[in-house]
């Protein structure tokens, strides 16, 4: 029996609704938040599958969608040497259950997704920032997060510590034009008259 059939058989046995999706060459499924933990637990404990390793957990943001956030779980079966992708779609107001009781490693991953996107995981109360500063405002990987951020950090000589203050751009926005302003001179430089029509072959260039 193929891997996809084994997974679908396992899901049906546990009354878990899953939807196959295309993610390049990887086997992938989409599940609703309420089916996430039963599905992860079944995949991990199945003697046939043994997806016992959570290799990654991350988020993406598609603000044009009603369910703007994707939370993606990458699983590995050492027994089968196979990988599996599980996706969960949620809106900005929805939460997603924490997988900490199934995969201990998910704690840090969930903190990262919260830090970058503001997605809340039920059961994981550790909301400490993990990539940004503890007093950072907002979630920088959201598509609607401003490029400048909301605050800037500077060392305050009077306070003798790092202080937060409103963004004050020292350099104005510029329009970057990567075309060169340098052009070859139209006049003949001394010695150019001695140039031959053919550059030596070892240079690899001919006129």
Curated annotation (Swiss-Prot):
Q: Which residues form the signal peptide?
A: none
Enzyme Commission code(s) on record: 7.1.1.-
* Topology of this chain in the membrane: Peripheral membrane protein
Cellular localization per UniProt: Cell inner membrane
Keywords (A to Z) from UniProt = Cell inner membrane, Cell membrane, Membrane, NAD, Quinone, Translocase, Transport, Ubiquinone
* Main localisation: membrane
Q: Which reaction does it catalyse?
A: a quinone + NADH + 5 H(+)(in) = a quinol + NAD(+) + 4 H(+)(out)
- GO cellular component terms, semicolon-separated: plasma membrane
| One MF term in the entry's GO annotations | NADH:ubiquinone reductase (non-electrogenic) activity
In Swiss-Prot or TrEMBL terms, this protein is called NADH-quinone oxidoreductase subunit C
Organism (species)? Rickettsia felis (strain ATCC VR-1525 / URRWXCal2) (Rickettsia azadi)
Upper lineage ranks? Answer: Bacteria, Pseudomonadati, Pseudomonadota, Alphaproteobacteria, Rickettsiales
């Amino acid at each position: 029996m193929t891997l996809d059939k084994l997974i679908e058989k396992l899901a049906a046995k546990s009354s878990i609704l899953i939807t196959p999706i295309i993610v390049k060459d990887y086997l992938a499924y989409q599940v609703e938040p309420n089916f996430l933990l039963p599905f992860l637990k079944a995949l991990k404990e199945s003697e046939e599958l043994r997806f016992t390793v959570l290799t990654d957990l991350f988020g993406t943001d598609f603000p044009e969608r009603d369910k703007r956030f994707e939370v993606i779980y990458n699983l590995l079966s050492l027994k089968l040497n196979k990988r599996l992708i599980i996706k969960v779609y949620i809106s900005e107001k929805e939460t997603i259950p924490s997988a900490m009781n199934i995969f201990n490693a998910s704690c840090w991953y969930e903190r990262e997704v919260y830090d970058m996107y503001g997605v809340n995981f039920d059961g994981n109360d550790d909301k400490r920032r993990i990539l940004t500063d503890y007093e950072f405002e907002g979630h920088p990987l959201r598509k609607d997060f401003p490029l400048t951020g909301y605050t800037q950090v500077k060392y305050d000589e009077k306070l003798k510590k790092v202080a937060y203050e409103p963004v004050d751009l020292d350099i104005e926005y510029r329009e970057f034009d990567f075309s060169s302003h340098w052009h070859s001179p139209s006049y003949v430089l001394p010695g150019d008259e001695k140039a031959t029509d053919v550059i030596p072959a070892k240079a690899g260039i001919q006129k």
